[in-house]
Regions:
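A glycine/threonine-rich phosphate-anchoring loop and its flanking beta-alpha core
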Residues: 1-37, 134
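Catalytic-loop motifs flanking and including active-site residues across diverse enzymes
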Residues: 17, 21-24, 44, 48, ...
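Glycine-rich phosphate/pyrophosphate-binding beta-alpha loops
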Residues: 79-113, 184-189
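Gly/Pro-rich interdomain helix-loop hinge
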Residues: 101-173
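Short alpha-helical scaffolding segments that buttress acidic/His motifs in well-ordered protein cores
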Residues: 25-29, 74-82, 95, 117, ...
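Glycine-rich phosphate/diphosphate-binding loops and the adjacent beta-loop-alpha structural elements
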Residues: 31-87, 97-101
Length: 209
């Protein structure tokens, strides 16, 4: 059971608002891009993206934590993300789960998702049919926009790290992280198959942003 009361989030610090908000956005995006067929879940995910990003409620909530309307819409987007990912998640979560499993790093899951998301959007680009056009529409971008670059800009505007290196992930950890990510259940609903070697390359790219 989840109690989804946006008034409980009014005192959440800006950095945590940004990180948890991007966790919700990533849930919605990965659910949309999952190859599993579930049109209702896709529609719910698209609405969550539109609320958080297209309508600017994540940026508004970070700028003013007391903005009750922004908090309500972000709570709705988070709830929609949870409903949408019944369709499956993807390689962003596989990679963030692997990083989060290293307790010595003490890395925040939502921040990891935000930082890794652009790398996976680049990786999946040619394997999602027309879904990037739908994603751009929900985000309030032109159809020709690059959603990966849009997320990089959003992360910067939210004050989140630009890459995994800034979060303390070391290059010598890549082999173990890649093995963990390749075994993660979310890998199986990524629109593009990803091998251990793919994950090694993806971590290398995410380290530098």
């Amino acid at each position: 059971t989840a109690i989804c009361d946006p008034s409980l989030t009014l005192g959440l610090p800006a950095r945590l608002t940004a990180a948890t908000g991007m966790d919700a956005v990533t849930h919605c995006i990965e659910a949309l891009l999952s190859p599993a067929i579930n049109p209702p879940a896709e529609a719910v995910g698209c609405d969550g993206i539109e609320r958080a990003v297209g309508q600017g409620h994540l940026l508004k909530a970070v700028a003013d934590g007391q903005d009750a309307d922004a908090r309500w819409n972000m709570m709705m987007a988070a709830s929609e993300g949870a409903m949408a990912f019944s369709k499956g998640l993807g390689a962003v979560h596989s990679m963030s789960h692997a990083c989060g499993a290293d307790q010595s790093l003490r890395l925040h899951h939502g921040t990891l998702n935000a930082v890794i998301l652009p790398t996976i959007l680049d990786f999946n680009r040619d394997h999602v049919g027309d879904k990037y056009a739908r994603l751009n529409s929900a985000m309030g971008n032109s159809k020709e926009s690059d959603p990966a670059d849009a997320i990089r800009t959003l992360n910067s505007d939210l004050g989140l790290p630009a890459n995994l290196e800034e979060m303390g992930v070391k290059r010598d950890a890549i082999p173990d992280l890649a093995q963990h990510a390749a075994r993660d259940i979310c890998t199986f609903t990524n629109p593009r198959p990803a091998s251990v070697e793919d994950y090694e390359d993806l971590y290398d790219k995410a380290l530098s942003g």
